[in-house]
């Protein structure tokens, strides 16, 4: 419906205001929902502008930017060296703006004595190399793995950031939705799961250490936006060159406290205020 | 004039009307055929497209594969990976395991209930039990699935000390609950269809109610019961929501029923929504859909066949 509304809006506006800015946003599926909400809110405040948002994946979005078929590319990862080169060949100079943050919490059962794990241990656990809690200093019990279905952005993000693109253990039980994962871990004393920040109810968040020597950090809005929590990432918008005019107005609005509040409403983590201000286009 | 209102002009109308009604009757058939064609069409690239075959050929889906150099060959379902793996064996095993548990749980209960209601229960008791069991059929599977995920899994784990909370037994029992009304209804109908003359003959020969039921009615209705079991099996294989929620969805090769399983239907439900359109993964999911379609079609056909044979036999036509 929302997308339909955007399309209808597009048609109407095309008839009424010939000079209206027409912006296309394309890319990451993780960011589609946020992009759509931003577009809706922005269009409410600026009735003249028309924004079209679609997904397809970060790679698709970046390809579209390189081919000049989108104004804004949404990406849940930074562009690769190779992609920058491709863009240059086509006369495109990508301009990167971090617009929001995203983080993943690791859940443990409240009865589990383990309270913190390193990224290496997490990788070992989820790739199936570590199968017993005693290998990470816990009880002599089999580790029961819970995760998300492979269609979820969370699945991909965790795989990329924690497993370094290695496969999940075949034994990982996948459940539809973070709520189901939290529920399963809350009932399974030896379970471990992952999902969005601020979901932990009836389970405890596991503090995560970047490596053996660093401090264990619990996932909260503050530690993610402060950058100390290791399983987090920046989400980007890419433009062709430094944005001007309508595009500039849009990105600055998205970075404004108002835009960042929208991000928080749809379960993303807002950028710290100073970073958001710094990222704004002058 | 009034008398000949239906002649001769209305011949055409009659013809059209008749064909229209026939078309309505055929609509379901055409629907099924079109659905099958559509599903199969999306699976075709597995057999024809070189590029797709490189990732997911028929042999890659069936046999053990070496995915990384220097590692043991294995069956694995990991479609989202740097090396996508599309082995169907773990999924097939999971589907069968869930269906077996479902049948082991549902058949004794459903057949027992059918024998009781058709042979022993008083009229009032029968009027009470039948609708309640048939009400189970109307229970949305998502509700059953949720029940299995939240309640049943814990009960089973506490009672039997399973390592894995969500496993083939948990999913199978929940599936069994969904299958009971199917088996019960068909089996009960089959027993009721046993002609009264046969019963009367048995009673006349001095058989008591137990003997009538177990040596007379049950053997006569056996094909009907078998048909119910077969139809129930078909449902157990195709049922999606329950297994998606209650089985744990881990695609592993294991003979143990206490471990998690991933079924064909749950795989399609979980992965199709976000799969890249036209990718090998997309084709494989539709191939699984085709397999499921054929499985359930053949099974249901078999069930119907048995049922028809029974009817003919009881009516003395064969």
Task: Set out the residue ranges of the language-model regions.
Chain B
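Transmembrane alpha-helices
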Residues: 186, 195, 203, 209-246
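Cytoplasmic-entry segments and transmembrane alpha-helices of multi-pass inner-membrane transporters
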Residues: 18, 109-148, 186, 313-318
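C-terminal transmembrane helix and the adjacent membrane-cytosol boundary/short C-terminal tail
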Residues: 188-192, 196, 203, 230, ...
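Interhelical loop and adjacent transmembrane-helix boundary motif
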Residues: 157-159, 243-293
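Transmembrane alpha-helix signature in integral membrane proteins
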Residues: 85-116, 229, 298
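Membrane-embedded alpha-helices of multi-pass transport/permease systems
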Residues: 40, 108-115, 132, 143, ...
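Periplasmic/extracellular loop-to-transmembrane helix junction in inner-membrane transport proteins
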Residues: 3-16, 20, 41-102, 122, ...
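Generic hydrophobic transmembrane alpha-helix motif, especially the helices
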Residues: 134-179
